[in-house]
């Protein structure tokens, strides 16, 4: 998993 994708997934989970 790329760092950018990890940040995106983390942001999505954080928003949820």
Curated annotation (Swiss-Prot):
It is an enzyme of class 1 (oxidoreductase). It is found in: Mitochondrion matrix. GO terms for molecular function: pyruvate dehydrogenase (acetyl-transferring) activity. Its cofactor is thiamine diphosphate. One of its GO terms (cellular component) is mitochondrial matrix. Keywords: Mitochondrion, Oxidoreductase, Phosphoprotein, Pyruvate, Thiamine pyrophosphate. It catalyses: N(6)-[(R)-lipoyl]-L-lysyl-[protein] + pyruvate + H(+) = N(6)-[(R)-S(8)-acetyldihydrolipoyl]-L-lysyl-[protein] + CO2. Its EC number is 1.2.4.1. The pyruvate dehydrogenase complex catalyzes the overall conversion of pyruvate to acetyl-CoA and CO(2). It contains multiple copies of three enzymatic components: pyruvate dehydrogenase (E1), dihydrolipoamide acetyltransferase (E2) and lipoamide dehydrogenase (E3). Tetramer of 2 alpha and 2 beta subunits. This is Pyruvate dehydrogenase E1 component subunit beta, mitochondrial.
């Amino acid at each position: 998993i790329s760092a950018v994708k990890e940040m995106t997934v983390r942001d999505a989970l954080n928003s949820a």
